[in-house]
Amino acid sequence: MEPDPSLSHSGSGNSHDFQWMVLPDGAFQSCGQTRTQLPAGAYSCAQDCYGRSQFHPQPLLADDYIDFPGSLPSRVLRDIALFWAARGRFERIGFLHRRGFLFYGKQGCGKSSLIHQIVQGVVAAGHVAFFCDHPYVFLAAMQEFRRVEPERPLVCVFEDIDATVKRFGDAALLQWLDGNHQVDRVVNLASTNYPERLDRRIVSRPRRFDRLLRIDAPDARFRDAYLARKLHGQPAAERARWVELTEGLPFAALAELVISVACLGNDLEESVALLKSLDAGAPSSLEFSDGPPPNQGDEPEANCDGSPVGCCR
């Protein structure tokens, strides 16, 4: 059925009046307040009981991550800005306008905080970001989003992508990363503690993830900036001592150290020693390097009818 031009809504922002929704059989049903665009922000994807896509605001958790000129978040945001501006060149050569970044490293080094900070920058530029929890629900939501907003730049986030693949398999993700759904103007951001658990089809094929970036424990400049922000009024010499003692501690341990010493009154050196012993005892990704290939003997979860978990039938 061809859309009726008289039903189109001009302008932008909210429509404060109820409107008529056109049903497939030509019938009409009232619908509530509408918008021509999603507000700039981060969203998770879901489905209602009828399988219709929904977008729920997603809180961002980047408050503690310190940014400064030349930092990784600022470099990635610069790359993304250059990528958005290059759309015409992609089209002239005949490529989908897509880009992918995979962040990897041991747990606690700040991958999620880094991604959330990048997303904050994307949102500040007026764009939208979508977090993928269930690949099949996510794919349906992205296709629905493009029906409403066909040209808007978007960022898609896949945190702990290895866990997503283990639970749901990689078929839907590979379709998305390959652009099989022809959803254009996309930047994909993913993270993993265990890159070796991911099939080489994901990590070793260009155009799925074009940049693989290792995230290590924060360096001295980052630690100094973080401690200066958290420990207001601390003498420079004392902060330098903290910076020296915390060499090699991951981001999460650095936050715990501030709580342990500044909030709970524990001894600095004893707290550092305890946190370093805990970090040394944490599972390393190297322990899994000789394990079975991803999904071997570990089938993705499914509903009783065989459809993937999270897929509304």
What are the language-model segments listed below?
Residues 1-87, 97-98, 103-108, 114, ...:
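AAA+ P-loop ATPase mechanoenzymes
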Residues 2-41, 205-206, 212-313:
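C-terminal alpha-helical "lid" subdomain
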Residues 67-240:
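Walker A/P-loop NTP-binding motif of AAA+ ATPase domains
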